[in-house]
UniProtKB/Swiss-Prot annotation:
The gene is mnmE. Keywords: Cytoplasm, GTP-binding, Hydrolase, Magnesium, Metal-binding, Nucleotide-binding, Potassium, tRNA processing. CDD domains: trmE, TrmE_N. InterPro entries: G_TrmE, GTP-bd, GTP-bd_TrmE_N, GTPase_MnmE, MnmE_dom2, MnmE_helical, P-loop_NTPase, Small_GTP-bd. Pfam families: MMR_HSR1, MnmE_helical, TrmE_N. (6S)-5-formyl-5,6,7,8-tetrahydrofolate binds at residues 21, 79, 118, 442. This is tRNA modification GTPase MnmE. Mg(2+) binds at residues 228, 249. It comes from the Bacteria. It comes from Campylobacter jejuni subsp. jejuni serotype O:6 (strain 81116 / NCTC 11828). It is an enzyme of class 3 (hydrolase). HAMAP family: GTPase_MnmE. GTP binds at residues 224-229, 243-249, 268-271.
């Protein structure tokens, strides 16, 4: 990490200011050259003109120097607050490169912060999740995780396992001495408790992932029952083509919208029916796949048409699902000839006139999800908690069988999984993969 890196830290485009970030051994040197200053006071904002190597002015800017190790990365950092827009920050960045800086890789500032002990990989992931959060509720949950509760919990579990492993491996070296029964009981209890905690984290994260990522909603029904009209009404703008011709929607259409504090990702599917049209058949197959992926299903029927075999197929398709289903009787402003033979609790509405009742029902259902507890969005971390929990659970059983070597193997597996997200982890190849999806300048 001897080189000095630079990147634009703000979003690209027109704005009032743009921030260029510089980190590394030569950060202060480059800043002094650009500003024609002889010194900078750490953690003070300095208003200055910036010049290129031909002594031509680049911009007037605010410059802030963070002296190592008291900075985001743990290295010397200088941040330049220039005027916004497409050009000024780009010119400044080019000048820094000409002085000897290197363009930063995605997430490289955060990676350096982790390698220098300024944050754990877990906190870095939380910061990235917060940046990418798409709803107020998601931001609230992620911000809560950033306060350190999850990191402290994982570190405590890892420390418990390391201490236990060290003791057990010593006992293996002195095989003639059996572990005291009271100590065996303590270790067994520790394994049971920590396995349970990790299981709660990954099961809660999986069951409530919609609170962070957004709940997936699939609209399903036979052709021409008003699915596209319902999609447009939920989005409050015309996204899908509405036509009296059955089969107009042949592909799945996915859009996002907010209902209260919740993000919803809604999918309008092709009408499900028997068809010889090859393209429509593909659309029907995609519709069925969307049902599998959905968290919530809006099953739409037409109040103005007599129930037929195609409607029955929709009922049959949804008969064994464990997904939450809202049964919708659309076009209820017209003469109602649909017979509710399935005794479903239909929401009666007109997608082209008023869907207030559906929105209220959706909101009540979403509000029933408790946002408390530890939830994570990183699939990698969820899998690590699952693998660790299962390994610790297996270790408990092996301890009861006095298979200490296998017990140690399982504990090692759990420790290595948790260590990837705690403060002592240093494996560059995993960090490269983790931070490769981060923003430039972060």
């Amino acid at each position: 990490m001897s080189d000095t890196i630079a990147a634009i830290a703000t979003a690209h485009g027109v704005g009032s200011i743009s921030i260029v970030r510089l980190s590394g051994e030569r950060a202060l040197e480059f800043a002094l050259k650009l500003s024609h200053k002889t010194k900078l006071t750490p953690r003070h904002a300095t208003f200055t003109k910036l010049f290129n190597q031909n002594n031509e002015i680049i911009d007037e800017a605010i410059m802030i120097y963070f002296k190592a190790p008291y900075s985001f990365t743990g290295e010397d950092i200088v941040e330049f607050q220039t005027h916004g827009g497409f050009s000024v920050s780009e010119v400044l960045l080019e000048e820094l490169v000409s002085l000897g800086a290197r363009l930063a890789l995605a997430g490289e500032f955060s990676k350096r912060a982790c390698l220098n002990g300024k944050m754990t990989p877990l906190k870095a992931l939380n910061i990235q999740d917060l940046i990418l959060s798409k709803s107020a509720l998601a931001a609230k949950i992620i911000a809560r995780n950033m306060q350190g509760n999850l990191g402290e919990l994982l570190e405590k579990i890892r420390t418990d396992l390391v201490k236990t492993l060290a003791f057990v491996e010593t006992s293996i070296d002195y095989a003639d001495d059996d572990l005291p029964s009271d100590l065996l009981e303590q270790i067994s209890t520790m394994c049971e408790e920590n396995s349970k905690i990790l299981k709660e984290i990954y099961t809660l994260s999986q069951s409530k992932k919609g609170l962070i990522e957004g709940f997936k909603i699939a609209i399903v029904g036979k052709p021409n029952v008003g699915k596209s009209s319902l999609l447009n009404a939920l989005l409050s703008y015309e996204r899908a083509i509405v036509s009296d011709i059955a089969g107009t929607t042949r592909d799945t259409i996915e859009e996002s919208f907010k209902l209260g504090t919740h993000l919803l990702r809604i999918i309008d599917t092709a009408g499900i029916r028997e068809s010889k049209d090859a393209i429509e058949q593909i659309g029907v197959a995609l519709s069925k796949k969307s049902l599998e992926d959905a968290d919530i299903i809006l099953a739409v029927f037409d109040a103005s048409r007599v129930q037929d075999k195609e409607d029955e197929k929709i009922f049959d398709l949804l008969a064994n699902t464990d997904k939450k289903i809202f049964w919708i009787l659309n076009k209820s402003d017209l003469e109602n000839v649909f017979k509710n033979t399935q005794n479903k609790n239909f929401i009666k509405l007109s997608a082209q006139k008023d869907i207030t009742l559906l929105k209220e029902e959706l909101q009540n259902y979403l509000n029933s999800f408790d946002s408390e507890g530890i939830m994570v969005s990183s699939l990698d971390l969820i899998n690590a908690c699952k693998i660790s929990s299962e390994a610790i659970f297996r270790a408990k059983g092996l301890l009861e069988e006095s298979s200490l070597e296998l017990f140690a193997f399982e504990l090692n597996l759990a420790i290595n999984e948790l260590a990837r997200f705690t403060k002592d982890f240093q494996r560059d190849e995993i960090l490269d993969e983790m931070f490769g999806n981060f923003c430039l300048g972060k």
